[in-house]
Amino acid sequence: MIKLLYPEFWQKRNIIAYLLLSISLIYQFLGYLRASLARPIMLPAKVICVGNCSVGGTGKTQIVMYLAKLLKARNVSFVIVTKAYGSNLKSATTIHQGHTALEAGDEGVILAKYGAVIATKNIKEIVPLINELKPDIIIVDDFLQNPYFHKDFTIVSVDSQRLFGNGFLIPAGPLRQYPNKALDAADLIFLVSSHQDKIPNILTPYVNKLINAQIVPSNNIDKTKNYFAFSGIGNPERFFATLKNYGLNITGYKIFPDHYNYLQADLENLYSLAKEHNATLVTTRKDHVKFNDLNNNIVCLDVELSINNPDLLNEKIFKKAQIFN
């Protein structure tokens, strides 16, 4: 997997974006060819797929966590399927809380706290494991563009600040697919980190299935200290904004590529930077799980999803997925 930072031209078009357009056309053709040749399988349970149209953090993990808690409260059995980004996984594996991020991916380790998790790089490999676990629902994280399985219910996550970037496909832009088709097909659309009342124009046709959501801190952190922040996630700017909105004094920050696997040298450099700033290190849960026993002096900001209209979510999911039939 190529690990990239989110370049500026992905948000605002410049000469680099236009120079890369020819490669984007190849990406588009290969995606069309893949979808045309695919023969989607029916997984042995109803599928809720959570995904996005673009590269970078849009709050998918928090949506999956929210769904897991919702289903657990209703006594609905479920399994979460995740892609195991950044792991050395060779085949589909059932994840437990003893797995490390290198073995299961950072998201797999985090999600294992909420229920049964299968980490895989090939969706077809999960079938035997699903047959063993026999869930009512499969929550699939980040396989929206995968044409090889049937989806009963789809949720598209959109970051309210980045939206769809410059509107170009990878690598000229951040898009995995053009949004209109995905938004039309979606059962629900989450506009994440939306603190404004105005809905972006591109989403106004979908207001009847739009949920405004915020990612908010879920643990208490000492606000009297100075903090040096770092992260290797898809949308680090949102993490830093969350820290500041929480009232923490951030004296500096460092950004790593998404799903970055930290080395001992990185950790030593971070401690040195924190010392220079007379600060304590603070990071995300996705980064924190990668340090194992070395993270005792690193503060972790836990976050969760807060939504403004949970009734719409409940109605659409439990009605269309027919969980209680």
From Swiss-Prot:
InterPro entries: LpxK, P-loop_NTPase
Similarity remark: Belongs to the LpxK family.
Pathway assigned to this chain's UniProt record: Glycolipid biosynthesis; lipid IV(A) biosynthesis; lipid IV(A) from (3R)-3-hydroxytetradecanoyl-[acyl-carrier-protein] and UDP-N-acetyl-alpha-D-glucosamine: step 6/6
GO cellular component terms, semicolon-separated: plasma membrane
Name listed for the protein in its UniProt record: Tetraacyldisaccharide 4'-kinase
Molecular function (Gene Ontology), one example: tetraacyldisaccharide 4'-kinase activity
Enzyme class: transferase
Alphabetical list of Pfam families matching this protein: LpxK
Catalytic reaction list: a lipid A disaccharide + ATP = a lipid IVA + ADP + H(+)
GO BP terms in the entry: lipid A biosynthetic process; lipopolysaccharide core region biosynthetic process
Organism classification: Bacteria, Pseudomonadati, Pseudomonadota, Alphaproteobacteria, Rickettsiales
UniProt KW keywords: ATP-binding, Kinase, Lipid A biosynthesis, Lipid biosynthesis, Lipid metabolism, Nucleotide-binding, Transferase
PANTHER family: TETRAACYLDISACCHARIDE 4'-KINASE (PTHR42724), TETRAACYLDISACCHARIDE 4'-KINASE, MITOCHONDRIAL-RELATED (PTHR42724:SF1)
Disulphide bonds in the chain: none
Keyword Ligase: no
Record keyword Transcription regulation present: no
EC number of this enzyme: 2.7.1.130
